[in-house]
Amino acid sequence: MMPFCHNIINISCVKNNWSNDVRASLYSLMVLIILTTLVGNLIVIVSISHFKELHTPTNWLIHSMATVDFLPGCLVMPYSMVRSAEHCWYFGEVFCKIHTSTDIMLSSASIFHLSFISIDRYYAVCDPLRYKAKINILVICVMIFISWSVPAVFAFGMIFLELNFKGAEEIYYKHVHCRGGCSVFFSKISGVLTFMTSFYIPGSIMLCVYYRIYLIAKEQARLINDANQKLQIGLEMKNGISQSKERKAVKTLGIVMGVFLICWCPFFICTVMDPFLHYIIPPTLNDVLIWFGYLNSTFNPMVYAFFYPWFRKALKMMLFGKIFQKDSSRCKLFLELSS
C-alpha cells in the first residue's frame, strides 16, 4: 500500500517509500551540513564580537552576513531536513508559511549583504583616502538594515498574501497542494519577481562592482610597479603592501560571492524556468537544489578560514579556551589592520 502523510488519504500528500537505510543516510548527511553551518558561522560571529581589533565597519557587515548564514541552521534546515527525507510536512500549514518565508528571506538577505560588501570594497580599493569618511558605522548600519528589512518584507509579504501562486491558483490547488505537504511553489509572475529581486539584480550589481574593482586594482598595480622602477621605493612599497592587502580582501570576498552564485544559481534558474515549462521539475530535484543552495551558508566560514589569518588565529584561541582569559579581547590578531 502506498504510504501517505495524512490520515485522510484523498487529500493527503504521498510519502516516499525509501528504505530506512536511505533515510538514515540522508538524515546523517543533512545533520552534518547543519552542524557545520552552525559551528562555522558561530565562530565568525564570536570572533568579530569578542576581539576589539576586528571592530571595523567592514567586519560588522561580515558579522551580519555570518548571522544570516547561521540562522538557516537554526530556523530553516532542521525542518527542511524532515521534509526532504520524508516528503511530508508534520508542522502545520501556518508554520509552513513561516518556514518558507524565512527561507526566502535569509537566502535573499545573504546576497544583499554580499552586494553591500562589494560596495564597501569598492571604496576601500578605489577611493582609499575617502573610504573612512564615506563608509562609516552609520552607513554600515543602513546597509545592514536594508539587507534584513527588504528581504523580510518581500518574502513574508509574498507568502502570507499568497502572491507566490497568484495567476496559477488552479494548477496549485489541483496538482500541487495536499495535506501534509509544504511545497515551494511560484507562478510565472512571482517566479520572475523572486529571481529578479533575490538573485539577478543584486547579483548583477556585485558582478559589475567587482569587475570595476578588478580593473582599477590592476591599473593601481601597474602604476605602483612603474613607480618602483623609478626608485621611489620607500613610500611606494608601503602603498604597495596596503593595496596588496586590499586586493587580497577583494579576492576573498569575490570568492565568497562566487560560492553564492554557484550554490544558488541552479535553484533560481529552475524557479524562474519551471512555470514556463509547465512544472516539469520533480519535487526531489527541487529539494536537492534547495540543499545545494543551503551549502552557501556552510561554505562561507570555510572561505574565511582559508584566506583570513585573523580567523585562523581566533579559531585557535577558541579551541584552547584562551578567549576566556582576562583581556583576551585586546589580543592582536594581526600586526596591521586592513580597511
Curated annotation (Swiss-Prot):
Which Gene3D superfamilies has this protein been placed in?
A: Rhodopsin 7-helix transmembrane proteins
A GO BP entry: G protein-coupled receptor signaling pathway
Name residues in a coiled coil.
Answer: none
Subcellular localization is given as: Endomembrane system; Endoplasmic reticulum membrane; Cell membrane
Give glycosylation sites per the record. N10, N17
Predominantly, its location class is membrane
> Which parts of the chain span the membrane according to its record?
26-46, 60-80, 99-119, 137-157, 189-209, 253-273, 288-308
Keywords, ordered alphabetically: Cell membrane, Disulfide bond, Endoplasmic reticulum, G-protein coupled receptor, Glycoprotein, Membrane, Receptor, Transducer, Transmembrane, Transmembrane helix
Instruction: Answer yes or no on keyword Secreted.
Output: no
Disulfide bond sites: C5-C178, C13-C88, C96-C182
Q: What are this entry's molecular-function GO terms?
A: trace-amine receptor activity
How does the protein's chain sit in the membrane according to the entry?
Answer: Multi-pass membrane protein
* GO CC annotation terms, alphabetical: endoplasmic reticulum membrane; plasma membrane
Query: Superkingdom of this entry's organism?
Result: Eukaryota
**Residues annotated for 2-phenylethylamine binding in this entry:** D103
Q: Spell out the InterPro entries in the cross-references.
A: GPCR_Rhodpsn, GPCR_Rhodpsn_7TM, TAAR, TAAR1, TAAR_fam
Topological domains (Cytoplasmic): residue ranges?
Answer: 47-59, 120-136, 210-252, 309-339
Which ranges sit in the Extracellular compartment? 1-25, 81-98, 158-188, 274-287
Decide whether keyword Membrane is in the record. yes
Membership in a protein family: Belongs to the G-protein coupled receptor 1 family.
Biological function: Intracellular G-protein coupled receptor for trace amines, which recognizes endogenous amine-containing metabolites such as beta-phenylethylamine (beta-PEA), 3-iodothyronamine (T1AM), isoamylamine (IAA), cadaverine (CAD), cyclohexylamine (CHA), p-tyramine (p-TYR), trimethylamine (TMA), octopamine and tryptamine. Also functions as a receptor for various drugs and psychoactive substances, such as amphetamine and methamphetamine. Unresponsive to classical biogenic amines, such as epinephrine and histamine and only partially activated by dopamine and serotonin.
The record's PANTHER family line, in alphabetical order, gives:
HISTAMINE RECEPTOR-RELATED G-PROTEIN COUPLED RECEPTOR, TRACE AMINE-ASSOCIATED RECEPTOR 1
This one is known as: Trace amine-associated receptor 1
